[in-house]
C-alpha cells in the first residue's frame, strides 16, 4: 500500500495520454453543470456524480441507495458508487479531444521547447499550429524539404504538380507526427558533434537544443506528449459552483473555460461525422486549440478570454501563480484552528514567561481540553453534555479551565513577524476583560506598543508541541537577539527612568554623609524619611567593607544576583543591558528572567514615586542662544559679501554657509546641555535612554537648524527658532519638506524591506546545520572593517564565538591564546586584541564543505543561546531574518552632498539590495586587473590611467568625466584595487580576485551599510547569504562528462561528476565560479517546488517537467508545501523517534531528551519575585 504521508522524494514529468486516461474516473461529454430545477449535477457533465462521486455521503444520485451499509455498491439505475462525498476532491475526469492540440507551455515559453526540438522558429511553429501554413511532413521524391512551410496557394500548386507524392498538413497533428519521428539518442549524438565544429550564435543554439534533447532523453518523457490528445478535468470540489442568496450561482472561472473546450470539441466531432468541408473543420480545430490554450494559460497568446465586466478568466496557470495562487496562499500559508486575536495591553504584574489571556477567549481556545476534563472529573457523563456545559458557561467550567491551562503554554504572534522573536510562547494567566496582557519587556522583540496593536494566540495541542513551545519558544528562553547575541528583553522607557532616578546622586539633600552599619539599616532609614533616596551615605557592605553609595543604589542592588557584584554607579539603559548580558552569561536563563522581573518591579515603582512629568517650563532656552545666532549671521554676511564681489564661487559660498550654520547649531546644543539641570525631567529622560535624545531636545529648546529640500539638498537658510518659541510661517513651510519625506520614506521602506526579506529567506531556507565538522582545512582571515579611518566593526566582534582555524599565538611570548578547532570566547578575544594581533584566521561558513548546509565548526556559536550551535538549527532562515528585520531602519535615500556630481553613492536599503542581487552598481569604480604601477595622463581633454605590470604589459583605463581618482602618478596598485571612487562591480572582482576576494568584498560592504546606520549584525548571517550566491559554477569545457557547456551546476555535483569521469580514465570538465543574485540563486535551486513557489511559477514548472526533475525535499519550503515536518530542529530524522511521555502524576518529573528536567515554572519563580 502506498503511504501518501510518507515519501522522501517527488518527481514531476509530462503525462502521456494513456496515463491521463488511467487516472481518470470517466469521460466528461457534456458542457452542462447542474440542472437548474433539481439543482443536481447533470449526467456526463462537468459535475457528474457517476464520474466524480456522490455529492452527499453514502447516497447515490437517484436515491435508491442511502446509508453506510451500501458502502462500495454501484447503483444499477444511475451508476453512482455509494461512498463519501469527499472523493469529489480527489477524482479526475477527462475529455477525449477530436483533434490533438499543443500544450501552450511547451510551445510558447522562452525558449520554445517544441521549437528547439524541431529546430523551427516559434513564429513558424505558431503558423502551423494555428492553421495558417502547411508543413511538409514527408517530402517523398519531390523537390520539397522536410519541415518546409507552404501557404495555402503554394500547397495547391504543389498538389497539382506532384499529386500525392508528398505529405503536408497543418495543426497540432502535423507537429505531433514530426515529434514522433525524432530519435533522441541520434539527435543528441549529432548535436554533440556539431558543438565541436561550430562557433558563435550557431554554437549557442546547438547548446540550447542539446539541453532540451538531453532533458527528454534522461527523463524518459516522449516529445509527442507535449501535444495533448486527452485533457484531464480537475475534481469538481476544486472548481466549485455555489448558490448565492437570490437563486443565482457563483462558479469558478475554470468551469467556463472547460465548457468552451467541451462545446468546441463536441462541435468538431459533429462536423467530422458530417464530413464538413476542410475550411470549416480547420476553423473549428483552431478554435479548439485556442480554447485549450485559454484553459491552461489564459492570456499567454493573444487577448485573454474575459468574463463579465471584461475581467480575464483565471486559468489553471493563474491558480498557481502569485500571492493569491495555490502555492503561496494555501500551501505555504494556511489558516489554523485553535487561534484567536485581540488588542494587547500592558501587564506589569506578569512574570516574564506569562501572558494574560481573556477568560472567554481561553474558554473557546481550550474547549476540547475542558470538555475532556469535565467528563474525567465526573462533572458530565458524556462529551455531548460536557459541550453543553461549556456553551452555557456553568460555574464549574471556570474551575476546570484554571486546571487545564496550568502549564499549557500558548503562542503569541504579532504581525508583521519579521524575525523569530515575533512568535513566542507564554504560560497563560486568566484575566478579566477582553484584551490580551503582555509583559512589558517582550515588547522590544515584538516591536509592539499599546496604541491599539493586536496579537494572535495559538494553542499547541500535542504533548510534543507543548514541550517544544516550553523548551524552545518560552519568552524567558529567548532573552538574546539572534542577529547579534545581545539581550533583547531589556527594560525600556518607564523602567529605565525609574532605575535611573533611583540610582542618581544629588547634593545637599537630607541625610547626606550619614553612616550605617549595614544596608538594611540604610533602607530602613529611608523608609522612615531620615535620609533621601539620592543622598551619598557611607555603608558597611558584607564582604566589601565600608563604601560610599546612595540608598537608591542599595535598593537597586537588592535585585541583582550576588555573583554579579555591587553596582555603585548611575544606571542608565546601556548599563542595564550589560547587567542583563552578564547575568545571562554567568547564571543562565532562569536567573536572568528573575532579574528582569525584579528590575521591572523596581523600575515601575520608582518611576511612579519620582513623578517625573514634563511641563513647558522644563524646556529651558539657553541664554547664549541670541549671541551665538548674531555671531553666525555676521559671518554669513561676510561670506555673502565675498560672493557678491566675485571672490568666491556659488558652490564655495554654499559650502561655507552650511558650515557656519552647522557650527552654530552645535554651539547652541552645547550651551543647552550646560544650562539643563541634572534633575530636569527632559534631560533625565534623554540621558537615561528612556525616551528621546539630544537632537530632539535641541529642537525643543535650542534651534531646529538646517533642513533639506525635497530633492535632499540642504537649504542654506536655517530654522533659528525652536518649538518652545514657535516657528514663523516660512520656517514652518521649510520644515514640511523633511516631514513629508520622512513619512513617504517609511511607507516605501516597509514594502521594500519585506520583499528583500522574502528573497533572502528563499535563497537560504535549506541551509541547516547538518554535521559536526566538514573537515575543511580552509577558512578566512579577518581584520577590523574600516570606512576611511573610522573603525566600523572591531576585530573582537568578528572573532567572538567563531572557531579558530589555526592556533593563535602571542607575537612576543609565543603563548597559545586560542587553540585550532576551538571556539574563541570573550576572554580569549580580549587577550588576542590586547596582544596587538591584527589578523586572525577563523573557520567560516564561506569555506564550509558540508553538502546541503553547514557544519557546527564552520558556523560557531548560536547567538540566540550563546552556546555552540546544535545540529538541525535552521541557520539559513535565522540569517535571512537577521538581515531583513533591521531593513526597515535603513534609510532609502541617496545622500546628496550639496549637489556635487559623482558623490552620489547608493546607501541604505537600495545598496543592500544592490549587493545581494549582485547588480552592476550605480557610480561604478574602475578597478585594476593586475598588479602594477600607475601613470595618470590627459589625452584630448580626457583623463586615462595606465597600469604597467611587472612583466611590462600595459592596460589603459578611460576615466569617465566627473569621476574622482583614488590613485596618484607612480602609485603601486594590486589586482582588484579601485582606481576611481565608487562601488565595485562584484562580477569583475570575481574574475580578478576570485571567489574569496568577492566574498570578503560583499561581506564588508553589507556590514558597512548596516553599521553606518547603527545596526549590528553578526558576520556569520551575511556569510550564509554570500555562500548561497556562490553555490554554482558555469561549465566551460565539458570534457568526457555529460555536462553541457555554459550550463549552471552546483559545485558539489560538478566535483562528483568529474570524480566519476576521472575514475573511468576520461577527460574531466572545467568550469568558472559564477556569482548569482539572490533572486536568480533562489530560482536556480535544485528543488523545483521551492523555486516554483517563489517566482516565475510557470517557467520553473515547464522546465522541471521536461527534465523530469526529482525533488529530494531537503529544504524547509518543499516540506511545508507537501505537509511534512520540516527537516530542521526536532523535525530532523535523528530526532524523530524521540517521543514526549505525559507525566503520570503531577508530582513526578519526566526526563527530557537533552538531559534537562522539564521544570515547573513555580520552582523557577519562587516567592522572591513577587
Curated annotation (Swiss-Prot):
The keyword Magnesium applies. InterPro entries: DNA-dir_RpoC2_beta_pp, DNA-dir_RpoC_beta_prime, DNA-dir_RpoC_beta_prime_bact, RNA_pol_asu, RNA_pol_N, RNA_pol_Rpb1_1, RNA_pol_Rpb1_3, RNA_pol_Rpb1_3_sf. The keyword NADP does not apply. CDD domains: RNAP_beta'_C, RNAP_beta'_N. Binds 1 Mg(2+) ion per subunit. Its EC number is 2.7.7.6. GO terms for cellular component: DNA-directed RNA polymerase complex. Residues 1145-1170 are annotated as: Disordered. Mg(2+) binds at residues 449, 451, 453. DNA-dependent RNA polymerase catalyzes the transcription of DNA into RNA using the four ribonucleoside triphosphates as substrates. The RNAP catalytic core consists of 2 alpha, 1 beta, 1 beta' and 1 omega subunit. When a sigma factor is associated with the core the holoenzyme is formed, which can initiate transcription. This is DNA-directed RNA polymerase subunit beta'. The gene is rpoC.
